[in-house]
């Protein structure tokens, strides 16, 4: 992390780089996110992905989710209070062992760059107030067949987080599970 920050500073000294040398947890997530206008979720566990989604919801912070596994990557953008949320689509984390870990299943390394670049484009579009964001749709990239598809979804009125009667009313640490897709 330190070397990446140094490289960013060397490339563009006008950029402010802030490091958070601690794990994201329910008790520190809101404080970590509070100063940012847009969050890009590059985490790799279900526990972290759900925590980022929940924290962004409670903080009212727009964010881009991404996940990769094997030869496939996915991304979507969430605008809390204005679009469907991560839990509208995925509900709860899968039980431990239900999804293979990244080391078990493997990950095509270039997927992180491809999906991360799409996330960066989403952030720029949001910050500039232009273009069509990936809200209420999941963009899926299949590297084996070099194809993209979109999966549309709507806000779930019964969503645990943003529904009419949410059961999640505070941040919580999820049970860690394998690598997240």
List PLM regions with ranges.
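Adenine nucleotide-associated cytosolic modules
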Residues: 1-181
